[in-house]
Each structure stands twice: as structure tokens, then as C-alpha cells.
């Protein structure tokens, strides 16, 4: 078994109904990864349709012409922004930091596209596996409350709370409730 040396915690914020809402959220300027959920035009249920990263502010990336064309395929769009829990990783100015973000994006895109019931509008990274073992832990924050955490919303149920890729296999798990028993 390969050695797993990369494990990252991603703090997700959302859902945002518009790009302007993203700008209002304190801390969103540190976000580098984003999800778009919605329904493909006249097809299927609501779900995750796009995973991307951006060196720039996510709101600006979502306004780009090529991105707006992809988003036009979706109805009932909502946006989720994410950042590494280690703040120095969120700056994608160096090649090493950009590569780290690319590996996280690839892990999420490949995991989601391998599930037969998910139809993504991503056209990149759908065929290449992560280049080395990697793991992420997803943590969910409320839209406008810095300290507020909550359980993963049902629309994001396809993303596990913990996702690992080791030896060409995906391992996934969700949060478990555990109540410690103390005998009296």
C-alpha cells in the first residue's frame, strides 16, 4: 500500500444564490475552490455539476465568459466556496501551491465522475486520476457565520466528509455520531 502523505481539510461555505452574495461573505476572498450545484437544463435532479479552482477571487472567475457559458446549462444554481484550513495554502501564486489545489480538484472531479448517477459539466480532469495518494476532510460552514458549522446539506450528499485516493482506489466515509458510554 502506498504511503498517504497529503491530507487536507477543506472548509466549505454556502450555499450562495448569487456571485454578489459570495462577495458579502467575510473570508470568501481566501477561497480557491468552488462547487456549482443545480439541475441540468430540463434533466435530472439537483446535484453537483461543477468543481473548479481559481487563483483569482472565485466570484470573478464565475463571471468569466467561458464560465457563464457552462453555467447557462444549469437551472436553480447555487455556489459553494472552499478554502484550505491552513491559510498559507490558499494563496495559489507559486507552482507548488497551484499543484496542491489541482490535486484536490482532480480528486473531487474524478470521484464524482466515477459515480454513474452524476452528470458533471466539467470537461477537464474527468479522465485523469490524482497523480499520488491524497486525502481530504470536508467541513461545512454556514453562509454568513464564521463560527457556525453544520451537517452537510443533502444536495452535497455525493461528496463524502472524508475522501481518500490510494493505490488507484477511492475510499470514502461520512461523519459518524459516537456517544461515549461511561459506566456510573
Name each model-derived stretch.
Residues 1-49, 55-184:
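Boundary/linker segments flanking structured domains
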Amino acid at each position: 500500500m502506498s504511503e498517504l502523505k497529503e491530507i487536507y481539510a477543506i472548509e466549505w461555505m454556502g450555499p450562495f444564490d448569487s456571485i454578489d452574495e459570495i462577495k458579502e461573505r467575510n473570508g470568501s476572498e481566501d477561497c480557491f475552490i468552488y462547487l456549482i450545484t443545480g439541475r441540468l437544463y430540463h434533466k435530472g435532479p439537483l446535484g453537483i455539476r461543477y468543481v473548479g479552482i481559481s487563483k483569482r477571487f472565485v466570484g470573478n472567475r464565475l463571471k468569466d465568459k467561458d464560465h457563464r457559458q457552462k453555467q447557462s446549462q444549469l437551472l436553480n444554481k447555487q455556489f459553494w466556496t472552499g478554502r484550505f484550513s491552513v491559510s498559507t495554502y490558499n494563496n495559489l501564486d507559486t507552482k507548488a501551491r497551484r499543484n496542491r489545489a489541482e490535486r484536490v480538484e482532480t480528486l473531487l472531479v474524478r470521484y464524482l465522475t466515477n459515480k454513474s448517477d452524476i452528470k458533471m459539466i466539467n470537461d477537464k480532469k474527468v479522465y485523469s486520476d490524482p497523480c499520488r495518494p491524497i486525502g481530504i476532510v470536508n467541513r461545512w460552514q454556514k453562509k454568513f457565520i464564521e463560527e457556525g458549522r453544520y451537517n452537510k446539506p443533502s444536495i452535497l450528499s455525493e461528496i463524502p466528509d472524508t475522501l481518500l485516493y490510494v493505490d488507484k482506489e477511492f475510499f470514502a466515509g461520512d461523519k459518524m455520531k459516537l456517544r461515549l458510554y461511561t459506566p456510573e
